[in-house]
From Swiss-Prot:
Keywords: Cytoplasmic vesicle, Endoplasmic reticulum, Glycoprotein, Golgi apparatus, Membrane, Sugar transport, Transmembrane, Transmembrane helix, Transport. GO terms for cellular component: cytoplasmic vesicle membrane; endoplasmic reticulum membrane; Golgi membrane. InterPro entries: TPT_transporter. It comes from the Eukaryota. It is a multi-pass membrane protein. It is found in: Golgi apparatus membrane; Cytoplasmic vesicle membrane; Endoplasmic reticulum membrane. The lineage of its organism: Eukaryota, Fungi, Dikarya, Ascomycota, Saccharomycotina. This is GDP-mannose transporter.
Amino acid sequence: MESSLAAIANSGPISIFSYCVSSILMTVTNKYVLSGFSFNMNFLLLAVQSIVCIVTIGSLKSFGVITYRQFNKEEARKWSPIAVLLVIMIYTSSKALQYLSIPVYTIFKNLTIILIAYGEVLWFGGKVTTMALSSFLLMVFSSVVAWYGDEAVSGSGNESFIALYLGYFWMATNCFASAAFVLIMRKRIKLTNFKDFDTMYYNNLLSIPILLASSIIFEDWSAENLAVNFPSDNRTATIAAMVLSGASSVGISYCSAWCVRVTSSTTYSMVGALNKLPIALSGLVFFPAAVNFWSVASIFVGFAAGLVYAVAKQRQQKENVSLPSSK
């Protein structure tokens, strides 16, 4: 029994499969809740996810599966600006996913990579190689193709047209918020020496009071609105999806570390690029989305862009490793 469990724990294919499943699960469950009839309590959804995340990693820690540092007030004070940025990022992400289909959301999310790359050039002395630049051009092209595919479908209705561009507004805001979050968090991690689960613990713990306060202040908690957000015919399924999406966020983090441990960072980066294809396709399978030549083409162009970017980053890492020995 122990040998079979050890074999699973050290299996590359199983770790890769688990990472892909957890990524798809979180995206699909979020979309299920957010695309519900007139769902408008995004802050509540995000608060529930953060609470579930804290409970889950706390349980895993008690069983000795993971470890993270104890709560420290001074560390929490220093980390609080990151938590605020996280709230902005996940809220704008939820709003974008509410209005856009999963394939379009996934494709436009690639544009965040461009902002982060040039942010690293400005703040950390990074560089953008020719191959990386080529992947950026492919990302922009895939986004234009996705926009054209959505435009072709939504052009007939005024309401859907407004909702579409509202989705693009939230997506653009999310790209900038995500880039700011990643870049500033990277700088803070270097100062605090946080590990993955330390980061997850503080991010979610500090986000909970912000999200709950925002929900109470900005969202309608009347009985009528709660009935709209949680209709009796699918109330249980909606709540279950909210809880499941919170647990799957832990799964993504755990499976990421698992995948890197039993394979390599190179394999993991390739899996991250390849995983965009099944996530985007899951949106076409599980939800009503624009299915035409342009929407399908944009998925595969975006997939190719992610693949080219992963290869570019691998080559750059190899060059960086070989630099000290060349001196």
